Amino acid sequence: MTAPADLSPTLQLACDLIRRPSVTPVDADCQTVMMQRLGDAGFKLEPMRIEDVDNFWATHGTREGPVLCFAGHTDVVPTGPVQDWQNDPFDALIDEHGMLCGRGAADMKGSLAAMLVAAERFVADHPDHKGSVAFLITSDEEGPAHHGTKAVVERLAARNERLDWCIVGEPSSTTLVGDVVKNGRRGSLGAKLTVRGKQGHVAYPHLAKNPIHLATPALAELAAEHWDNGNDFFPPTSFQISNLNSGTGATNVIPGDLVAVFNFRFSTESTVEGLQQRVAAILDKHELDWHVDWALSGLPFLTEPGALLDAVSSSIKSVTGRDTKASTSGGTSDGRFIATLGTQVVELGPVNATIHQVNERILASDLDVLTEIYYQTLVKLLA
């Protein structure tokens, strides 16, 4: 069934946003809708279009006192085969089971709607609140993420903007809304390793150097290496090879080089420099002719128990009756950029069971629960 007009304000806004096909980095006027609502609520608006990416920064309150920022993204991943969906992925339907179906329902237009409605209600109820309520919204989270939150944070840092606490609306929950929040993320360090050999005929191996044979022991050692033990907040650092390419396709040619793509998801117990040095030592130990191109996607960050995590946890408890679990599992998020400002960052959003899948969906009523959790958190920190 199509979402009826008598839905809650949060669900009405969520459906409006989902119906806008904002496949990364296209915003499809989602931010126009959000800025109009925030402007009407008295927020100061600052659009920041950077290259082909739409972003905005919005604030309500004074420069004196703490700042609580809601952060999120309007872009979504591609739908995949439309014919495999139970409905058009941009129709925003609520089915007979009460599930809100559509691309972005969980990741993360539902959260955006809940944040905005909670903030509207809070500034109406507490017009003279402490500090500031802020929004940092981008259309470049699901893509390269070069001109989105990262670029906005760089601008905010350059002018010494204060940002004490941040709630990122990523879908953190696993079974029930609020059962898990993310209080940190592992770092992500990628690499493209090239091992050079010498091309030749398979019948004359003495005239060639097979990079597959040469590199295999080193790759096996890298895969077996114990990088660290993790800690109370993070599991041990992991190393995974994702791609191996070598050869011409012919059966009688020894290849001239091998390319391996691998990734570290690393804890706060390891550093970028330390991991790079240990990789180099292993490759040199095996006397390889090698080169590595490194790509750092993000450093690990952690928000330890304190004002933000306490406020979020107690709000979840008061609204749902549930105790929440703080976790650092999963991939990277834009929280990694915001944390560089020294900000306490917590991710809290809907159930993530169907994110990036065909028939992405969440329980529609969860968005009203999420709205109340966000509202109560605002009250605890800024009222």
Swiss-Prot record:
Zn(2+) 1 binds at residues 73, 107, 170. Homodimer. It catalyses: N-succinyl-(2S,6S)-2,6-diaminopimelate + H2O = (2S,6S)-2,6-diaminopimelate + succinate. One of its GO terms (molecular function) is acetylornithine deacetylase activity. Pathway: Amino-acid biosynthesis; L-lysine biosynthesis via DAP pathway; LL-2,6-diaminopimelate from (S)-tetrahydrodipicolinate (succinylase route): step 3/3. This is Succinyl-diaminopimelate desuccinylase. It comes from the Bacteria. Keywords: Amino-acid biosynthesis, Cobalt, Diaminopimelate biosynthesis, Hydrolase, Lysine biosynthesis, Metal-binding, Zinc. The keyword GTP-binding does not apply. Zn(2+) 2 binds at residues 107, 142, 356. CDD domains: M20_DapE_proteobac (cd03891). Binds 2 Zn(2+) or Co(2+) ions per subunit. It is an enzyme of class 3 (hydrolase). Its cofactor is Zn(2+); Co(2+). Catalyzes the hydrolysis of N-succinyl-L,L-diaminopimelic acid (SDAP), forming succinate and LL-2,6-diaminopimelate (DAP), an intermediate involved in the bacterial biosynthesis of lysine and meso-diaminopimelic acid, an essential component of bacterial cell walls. The gene is dapE. The active site is at 75, 141 (proton acceptor). GO terms for biological process: diaminopimelate biosynthetic process; L-arginine biosynthetic process; lysine biosynthetic process via diaminopimelate. Belongs to the peptidase M20A family. DapE subfamily.
